Amino acid sequence: MNTKRVAVALAVLAALFSSGVQQADACTRATYIGPDNMVVTGRTMDWKEDIMSNIYVFPRGIQRAGYNKGETVKWTSKYGSVIATGYDIGTCDGMNEKGLVASLLFLPESIYDRPGDTRPTMGISIWTQYVLDNFATVREAVDELKKETFRIDAPQMPNGSASTLHLAITDETGNTAILEYLNGELNIHESKEYQVMTNSPRYEYQLAINDYWKEVGGLQMLPGTNRSSDRFVRASFYIHAIPQTADAKIAVPSVLSVMRTVSVPFGITTPDKPHISSTRWRSVSNQKDKVYYFESTLTPNLFWLDLKKIDFSPKAAVKKLALTNGEIYAGDAVKDLKDSSSFTFLFQTPVL
């Protein structure tokens, strides 16, 4: 590790421990890259209250708009997807039929606005869905997104929290891109090496911190708090330490075990540490075999949706797995999907 990155890491660590700024919510994401094209991505959803998530299946051929008034981006979905919502007003996680996984996580440093920006508008609630609808690979997505042809509109969430978020996308080859809006500019980090993402600080600083802990050595000591930077280091160590295997029966549970390792126990409340939020659910995407796994903290079973068994043709209906009333599913849940209308994406102005 070079001297400059050591200096950056130490400076950021000092700032994190001395700062009075607390993160309200948190999540962790990690991608496993194994032999024989075995790629598995897991994430936790950590939130200070029930985020009222449901699972939806979207077919191809849906006509969408990135905003509900004025000049916006419009498209027709090329790919079907399985997604998880937040508050049933936006897509926060999912995988499309090509094995592209997209995950939206909290980033308090996000600033989307540029002075006098007149570009077409894209709502933050539909940004993740835009990626899943339109791209099969990270390279395709990055080539288009780096053009910055739209601006992001980010209204407050239903609970009043700021929609300060960043997006991670990973394709079936294991290539990942981290997308962060900082001071109105889109910053993109793309590499197969970028296997882990959490929250604050901005991604380049997280990489520097992780470099520092690599020098310490995970077998000697790992940071154990629920801080974003500590979870990043633990997830990074374990995602590389678990067995290298082409067997999905080993790879998927291994990634799930990493996600459990970085989860925050349910019901944890620490008055002087409001940045600690309970893990509400975990997802794991087997991108080689196109299977989306989901585990709620409050239900006893893991369930999954095999995308190969789902009809994504344009004539197919939108389908839903309801999760907000204590529903319990186990194993292959394709049979439990019900025809449904879509949820309404949240934009700055009310949809009339």
Language-model features and meaning:
Residues 121-154, 248-257:
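Proteins synthesized as precursors that undergo proteolytic processing into mature forms
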